[in-house]
């Protein structure tokens, strides 16, 4: 096998999950020579704005995909939730490895439970999806946008006017943070995850047969089925970071996939949700999207995308 160059964002989390995946490959073949190349993406440069206000899909992947096309790197290790549902021609998701916990972590000052936060308490999040779902269930709370890596957000919780913050549990787990800092993990009934949350997508060139063969050895078929249902739903709904959209699939009994899709208005007042079972992940994602469109969910998306 030739020397492999892995493209990664420069954040601590991106570099850590890239190294963890490389370790997985080296466990299969210790002779592999793999190097990480750090790449700065457009999304990394935007630190003072809410990402949903910036617009555009692929804020964290476009520059990395360009390096794949130019053969500067051989593969990219993405957080799957950052990867748009349409992969450019010539590139492919070569494998979907094991999924980390897909839920969100709620961290509060003095570990006050979410349901006990008082009127006007401020919850920090960088996600419209989280904000909308929290406002829907707890309309007396205030959502305030928060950006930055995990360390920055935890520091802001201590030093600024936030009463609590919500962030992806997978990032905390991969960075080795103790469960002790988390007040609680919010299950799907409280906060439906983002599309692909907790999963990685390993992107490479479609014609790189040697690498695709290697990646097949760390591919998790069940996780791939689940995220395919989720990403099909995202594509069918024309979802973007301007839209509060959630989706989560699991393997149920009889090897069926159970998938729940969710579209909300940013203020949490409108909610469209549907759960279905099926064996074909693409058909399942389409089915749930069609139900939500009939309910009127697409009107929200159209409005938000037009305002972009």
Swiss-Prot record:
Keyword annotations from UniProtKB, A to Z: Porphyrin biosynthesis, Transferase
PTM annotation (S-(dipyrrolylmethanemethyl)cysteine): residues: 241
EC number(s) stated in the UniProt entry for this protein: 2.5.1.61
CC cofactor: dipyrromethane
Single GO BP term: protoporphyrinogen IX biosynthetic process
Cofactor detail note: Binds 1 dipyrromethane group covalently.
Any Pfam family: Porphobil_deamC
A GO CC term attached to the entry: cytoplasm
Further remark: The porphobilinogen subunits are added to the dipyrromethane group.
Official protein name in the record: Porphobilinogen deaminase
């Amino acid at each position: 096998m030739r020397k492999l160059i892995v493209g990664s964002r420069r954040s601590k989390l991106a570099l850590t999950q890239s190294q963890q995946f490389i370790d997985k490959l080296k466990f299969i073949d210790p002779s592999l020579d793999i190097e990480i190349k750090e790449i700065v993406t457009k999304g990394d440069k935007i630190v003072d704005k809410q990402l949903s206000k910036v617009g555009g899909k692929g804020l964290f992947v476009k520059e990395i995909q360009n390096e794949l096309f130019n053969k500067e790197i051989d593969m990219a290790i993405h957080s799957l939730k950052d990867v748009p549902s349409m992969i450019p021609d010539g590139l492919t998701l070569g494998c979907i490895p094991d999924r980390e916990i897909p839920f969100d972590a709620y961290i509060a000052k003095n570990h006050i439970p979410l349901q006990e936060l008082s009127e006007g308490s401020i919850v920090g999040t960088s996600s419209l999806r989280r904000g909308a779902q929290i406002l829907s269930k707890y309309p007396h709370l205030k959502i305030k946008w928060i950006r930055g890596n995990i360390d920055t957000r935890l520091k802001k919780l201590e030093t600024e006017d936030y009463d609590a913050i919500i962030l992806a549990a997978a990032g905390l787990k991969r960075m080795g943070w103790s469960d002790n800092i988390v007040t609680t993990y919010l299950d799907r009934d409280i906060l439906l995850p983002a599309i692909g949350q907790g999963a990685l997508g390993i992107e490479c060139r479609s014609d790189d047969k040697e690498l695709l063969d290697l990646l097949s050895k760390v591919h998790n078929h069940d996780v791939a089925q689940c995220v395919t249902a989720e990403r099909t739903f995202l594509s069918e709904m024309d979802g973007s970071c301007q839209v509060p959209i959630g989706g989560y699939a699991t393997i149920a009994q009889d090897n069926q996939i159970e998938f729940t899709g969710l579209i909300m208005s940013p203020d949490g007042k409108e909610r469209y949700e549907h759960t279905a079972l099926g064996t074909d992940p693409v058909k399942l994602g389409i089915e749930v999207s069609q139900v939500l469109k009939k309910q009127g969910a697409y009107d929200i998306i159209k409005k938000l995308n037009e305002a972009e």
